[in-house]
């Protein structure tokens, strides 16, 4: 068993101030509204956004807040090189947390 397999699957509610928690909610709603594509993996999900620098910065803020309150998640926001590249957010953590990621970060079909 890897050392990280022992990280509890529990949000650390005290990790964020009330203002940060409110901001997290705003950013999470924006994430849900902005996702263009979802890819499912064995250990989590990947979400594609439009190529908008301002959105990328806000999603980086969401990643920072989620990392503080959900240390059991692996969060990776990337925007590869090239004119046609778009940002992707990869949220993983193993099979144990996949349903949490699905229910928390995956938008319902429109």
Predicted regions and their residues:
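Amphipathic, hydrophobic secondary-structure cores in small proteins
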Residues: 60-82
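Secretory/periplasmic and organellar redox-cofactor proteins
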Residues: 1-57, 76-110
